[in-house]
Amino acid sequence: MMTTTVQKNCWRLDQTMLGLEKPGSSDISSSSTDTSAISPISVSSMPLSPDKEKKKISFVRYNPDIPQIVTSFKGYQKLMYQGYRYNIYQIAPERNFKSWRCVCAKKMHDGQWCKCRAETTMDNKNACTKGSHNHPPRHHVAEIEFIKSQLYSAALENPDHDAGDLVNQASMYLSDGVMFDNKESIKKSLVVARNKDGKPKKPRSKRMMKFEVDDDDENEYKMPKLETDISCFLPFINNMVKVEPPFSHTPTIQIPQPIPTPIQHQQQEQSNLLQPATLNGMNNPWMGMEDHLAMIWAANAMLNPGLDVLSTIAALSKHQQHVQGPSPQQAATAPTTASLSSNLSVSSFTPQMPKEASIAIPAPLQVLNLKDLKPLPPLANIQTSPVIQAANLLLPVAALKKDSSTQTTEEIKVSQCLTSGCGCRVIRICCCDEGVCRRTAAC
């Protein structure tokens, strides 16, 4: 009781300060009247606001004789006319013309499709059909789609209205015997349509580079745009890369006729005979070889990847120097092997060479086809080729004398290679008798 009295006195003091109660009015009857005005019963009996009341949504009933345009949940337009449904096919604003195609086009079970068309003006009036349908009209399907289209528009115009109540109100405008197949599915479709309404679509393009930047440095990390087309760089790339034709095209090598020139210019003229297409555009003036030998070697070098290029070039160069004779510089710096006896000269070896060891110089060819060339033997057997054998005959005799002293009689008779560990055969003439070298005393 004491607590209740204190609360009442405090309430009266507040009312007095606010000017709602005159001072001195402290009777119990007045206090009870004031408290009853804010009781829960009086609050619950107050009328609800207009927003909380159920709003009536008006729908238009289906009429098959009037062309009506509907919009599906996906945003596509359809024409409902005389129980048939049409999809938009062509729009021509300059002609005030719209063309519609039947929805049963290319969807018939018997393999045939409806070819009927409908035409309207741009304001969806003055509908007329072109052709005849090969199927009966489906009025109940057209009516359901027509009401669903109105539901879609009403849900977007009234976002606070309950979706279930909208579906129930729309069901009242259906004809007798026509009803929605699944009301819950329609409710979910309305909710999804409301959530997507007003939201921007996600961009299809994805960022190639993902990194976090500050707001101040945002402009510094933007990808630059190409001002010109990339095709302008193609000539520059073509100048850097040289495209060679594959060997499957069987290119031919043109070999011109040799022109008689002085000896001092012969080496330069022969080096110019090498075509750039054969050696990938490289001129080799240090290769003093004849034109047909050079072309044969170059073609075999391309066909045989195991060719020892350096040793073959050295052998061919020595053979060419022997055929042409020493140059003035080589004659001045000739080794002491020139004082050897005439019976050991190079000319003495030439008649005794077998046929397979001699180099047959063919007649000059005009066109050399790469298909006619045979690849050289592998690297392990390259020393037995005629070119290498002829080059071994041109080696200085001093080198032969130094190695021949270490050979046995059996090795000299079978003509084995002077190099230890090599199984190749060397074609030469032995000057020894019964295992005794006749030149040992001369050395």
UniProtKB/Swiss-Prot annotation:
Q: Which UniProt keywords apply?
A: Developmental protein, DNA-binding, Metal-binding, Nucleus, Transcription, Transcription regulation, Zinc, Zinc-finger
Q: What does this protein do?
A: Putative transcription factor. Binds to specific sequence motif 5'-[TC][AGT]TGCC[GA][AT]-3' in regulatory elements of target genes such as myosin myo-2. May modulate gene expression, perhaps acting in opposition to transcription factor pha-4. Involved in morphogenesis, perhaps especially in formation of the pharynx. Plays roles in molting, feeding and morphology.
What broad class describes the main subcellular location of this protein? nucleus
Q: Which residues bind DNA?
A: 46-203
Residue stretches of biased makeup (Low complexity): 25-42
Q: One Pfam family name from the record?
A: FLYWCH
Any one GO CC term of this protein is:
nucleus
Q: What is this protein called?
A: FLYWCH-type zinc finger-containing protein peb-1
List GO BP terms, alphabetically: negative regulation of transcription by RNA polymerase II; positive regulation of transcription by RNA polymerase II
The scientific name of the source species is: Caenorhabditis elegans
> Which residue ranges does the record annotate as region Disordered?
22-49, 251-271
What Gene3D superfamilies does the record tag this protein with? 2.20.25.240
Transcription as UniProt keyword: yes
Positions of FLYWCH-type zinc fingers: 69-135
Per its record, what are the GO molecular function terms?
A: RNA polymerase II cis-regulatory region sequence-specific DNA binding; zinc ion binding
Subcellular localization is given as: Nucleus
Q: What happens when the gene is disrupted?
A: RNAi-mediated knockdown causes multiple defects, including embryonic lethality, slow larval growth, abnormal tail morphology, constipation, abnormal vulva, and abnormal pharynx.
